[in-house]
């Protein structure tokens, strides 16, 4: 039940993901078919031409012989009388047939009675020789003595026919040969001479008979189609067919392993496991999903192989079962591979290579005589089992031509059995490896877990048992838990520890943590960035394996019983673990099903949860289109949906606006009953409000734990006074000492807690409480004097506790360091000023180039696997191809002609002596009784088998194919026989059938019949022998005599694969930087676009050129000929190729989002195009050569040009074929290349390659300038924007009027009528992200851009930074139009994206060095500047570790530091402090405050305290529109004049607390209320002012409050008022 539901859900998920990637589906279907198509194209090159089953008449000798086509004849010394008589008879017959005299035909013949001279003449004048006849020294087989004695009865007349060895069949072979049969005797002159000689012998010996002989191909028992594949089946399929099929099927495995590893890499699969995912359901779902596309394609491949009869003898059922089982094993192997990969970069390609390598080994195993048991044992590797299958399928169709030892061959059934066993083994291995192989994420079992009792039976423990065996933790900073409560803890952490190896050495992330958590409670985990909070959650959820210690969740041990724990877990990790393609509703439906919601309730539950978390309007929106806060809401819904009892929320409200945060608070309080919720947050008011217990972790250790009240009592020291400085005086002119002295006059024990940005806070001791009224009265009167804008007072806050503990721990750390790195405000400010004051010396393109090159060097050093994939593996492939070429070239060459000159007598004995079953079927017309008399003198009479004319001769021959080498069919009335044995007929016509499996069948059968006839009537036999001349090599054959075509083809294909892989690997890095927005950040930081591309091109070209030079040098050193002579040409070819395919790969990478998919797809595309085009070109060129057809060659030239223009890889192949002298590479009629640089040879492909190089390099260099170029033709400022809203705020309208006639140079940041409309798609309507906004920001102003999630803030910044083109409107930065003059407009800005754009392999120090060079800081100043920034943001401890391992807050520090480098004039900071703890936030505030003195800054934030501390002017966006625009005080005065009060009620006063406050404070109104928390507003009208001190006195005397904060109206109150309309109903409850 559970398994079935999860399987159904996961199948739906996989199909949704697959369906949203139609390009990938097309590739999955097309690529396998293309690979099989390539195989058939290769087979087509070597297929046997369709046999001609029509009768072919023997060429009439008399019509072909002539003075320019002479017949040579002779015998050693001289001819005897019989020999001369036969020749003279032949001459007479020719003369009679031609109507000439004998004298006139004498010139048709030439007598040469010296064998050597005859051969010499033929060698020199072969073009004018029809053939030769060489007589034996004695033709008297009857025992005559003298050479001139006539042949006696029973004697033999013998002769040898001499032709060029290539014009006759191979006399060294008797059986089947590749591509040859007896038709060569008919098509060339042998049969013509044989029949003419026999006719002359008949005439000379007085047998008046005219021979009319035809030849016909023996009807095979197979179809003609079957015959076509014999050569290809033997040469290709038997040896390499399984490789092609495996490569085709591995396309599905490639996609599968990549998808699975991506889900593993992005923590998605582990997140699903945390929430009770069944691993079997997960793997099964992917198998089924893959089979949906792969199974039809596999069956199509089966249909192709069986339909084409390439596989003929093996039944359909066996082939289908074999292919399908093999496909399943490949998919299962994908899962096994995925377990060993943590990075999707390499998994697909390496899996492909491994399987192909095993398959090649399988070919070796299947072809060699290993015992069947050994082959079956090796078949546990399914590629080897499949090689055995393809081998047996092939050889079963080749039994006619192969003699096989079946004792060493694995049968199809045995292979099927092994594939079935493999499936079982692989499933077991997947289950085992998935449990024991340690990955980057997830906890693993010990390798011997099968033998442990706990695995099979498990055991829950009580807290008492746990504490009996574990150490305990005791501290006065931990609130005591009653034993009764402690025994019911749901989570018990005991000495939990986690260590990491980093670039700075061993780092202890969690240091022996000891903690308990309970049901119905929210336990808040607090701590500075990098203290171990997320690591702790990772260990508790099974995402990370602990180094030591353990934890028990509901009594189960996380180190050994995680599978028992996970059904209870719901999780929202720090990073958003979602599928960007799926919608909100699809996510919730999937997880609802996974977590046990009943099927009929799933849709309703998912919709309800989407509504509950505030995503009702986004249900059908893809998750990738959500804002950061909306993604967190989705993750929250995922964590809570279903049956989860233990909920982990890691910074769940990070990136949320205040309204959304409060919605989440309500949600958590509503659903915490029956659950244990573990919450981490950097919003301390959130922890204070939600946390039933609060634990603070510092440096991996538990610092304190207890209720909020306990912590405040334990660490608080009274009250907190928070002052907001006037922004114009916050950095300059504000006298903190003066304020401090004033306060201490009234409250002597007061001390400064924080002084960051515009915020100044003091700790006021409780013992001075009686002095507060007088102090506040005087303080109110002196606010203007002290340049204080507003202030507030609260009892000890959790933030004060946090900061206090942080300062305390910092002091301890500094004391341990002997004070060498003393951290204090003065040193911090010195570092800050030094860092920010280091100016840019102006953009230096050489310096940028240097920085980017160093970046590539550092990445290569730290990512050895990528370096291997990009450089070492391609180089190995290329060098390997050269070695293979050399080794194959040194082997015996495969000749394109027959060079056998061994004499062979055309006698049936050459076959019958070895096989007594051979017979000669014969059919005569109407003379059934006389046929035996006709042939009874033949020595092979017993081999003749008469076939009655009533029997279909063709059918009989098919049925008895294996029993005869040929047959005879008389087509006229056979000769009548009289008692004197005198032939009465003058005509004898018959068809000699020849079996293609016996190459000499035709002349043997002609001799058999003619010999029998002569024996019958004259008692003389005929012996004919083939005695070939040495082959006269053509110029083509001479030029290709040293060529091994197979070696060249293999060389070209592997060389092509090496360069394709190189280009794909380089492009993968580009895709990754684009997806991670590193490239965008470089551009925004001032990096010249062409410098970015040039640096990558130069780095990649450098290694490509090294590979090219090595390849050329090795090739020239080991291969003689053109590769050495044309070293420069080939080197130029490889250099131009590299210059073409590398930028082409860059361009192709824009279609891919991940490194792995980019590498695999680009490599495959380049290789497949090159392969297909090469095979097509070779086919046409070989046809041109074979047929000597100049028109076909011209067509080939045109095709090659087109292919070269499409594929630079093909141009490489064309050049290699020319330089290697591959047949067909030269022009017809010439066999040597006179000028390699001519357009007929290297000229054209080199020019095309140069064109490719120029085109793709120019394209890639200009690509990023396209928006700017478009801007010249279609500038958004010329497009109409919608009219401003009629109810537009007055201040917003005033700003619009202010900027109406302002020159662009007057203020650094200006945008007018800025509008962005995103068009709709599918169920998602179009959305206006920014609505006709106008704003100007002068120098020295920090502007706060506030709003709800999805309100348009990030879209605005993206338009300002040039990343998104506006729908309409005008933007100018530093006086330059962003659209038309983008480079100058963005030349001196900096930006921090909402999501950190960092290179995970590089450290913080390396990032800062890189961006220092990008921004033009002098080299001599970089080191001091970088170190100052590192010290300023407190990253010294981890500065050398890769940023990929940093906490969210530390990543923000790095991002801000990079943005601040070079003293930029304009800064865009998008949620800069998101994920930062309170201490870090204040550090960042100091930086931004210092930076903002003379710069224009736009800041987005969801922390209103941050905005008040930093911003001098703000706007609040709602639905893309500005709801207000003024200074903070101006906004407060308009929308919230008076005081704001935030209180936390004691739980027992929850019901009456609101009314008590309303009654105690006149005119007080409720703004917001959540459980025990409430916000109030108290007006302060000028005519009847209320003193803050009075309100404070009232609150301090109310016993109903746990905590309170009172001050002038807060910005958060205004924000809630302007954006929180959905809170009206709750507020109205108290009206």
From Swiss-Prot:
Annotated residues for binding of ATP 1: 527-534
GO cellular component, one term: intracellular membrane-bounded organelle
Keyword field: ATP-binding, Membrane, Nucleotide-binding, Repeat, Transmembrane, Transmembrane helix, Transport
One Pfam short name: ABC2_membrane_3
Residues reported in the UniProt entry to bind ATP 2: 1347-1354
Main location, first listed in the record: membrane
Chain ranges of the ABC transporter domain: 491-724, 1309-1544
Subcellular location: Membrane
Topology with respect to the bilayer: Multi-pass membrane protein
GO MF assignments: ABC-type transporter activity; ATP binding; ATP hydrolysis activity; ATPase-coupled transmembrane transporter activity; lipid transporter activity
Any one Gene Ontology BP term: lipid transport
Residue stretches spanning the membrane: 25-45, 242-262, 285-305, 317-337, 346-366, 372-392, 416-436, 866-886, 1047-1067, 1099-1119, 1127-1147, 1158-1178, 1198-1218, 1242-1262
Similarity annotation: Belongs to the ABC transporter superfamily. ABCA family.
Designated name of the protein: ABC transporter A family member 6
Organism: Dictyostelium discoideum (Social amoeba)
